[in-house]
């Protein structure tokens, strides 16, 4: 049967394990944004962490296309990690959930930034067609 303390530890281990995998998913997500910014030549000013935002990247504004690609790079990284993680279904699930949550077009999310950049790109294209 075991002592009550051992039962608590058995319950706590999967929670801590899942939380740790979630933090790793978040770190890799932000690395995806950072790598995309560097590849696209957008200067990164600061990378930090806040209790209400998790990790964040402060960078110069790029073109609407650069901003769209940088915003999409985070969820894309998590999707790639989901597909590349058959050795750990829990790690795959953490990455999948993180990708979906960030891809939703809710203000402040990557999905919201992607939608705004997409609108800017369409406006620019419409302006070029009229000219």
Q: Predicted regions: what is each one?
A:
Residues 1-131:
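Hydrophobic transmembrane alpha-helices and their immediate loop junctions
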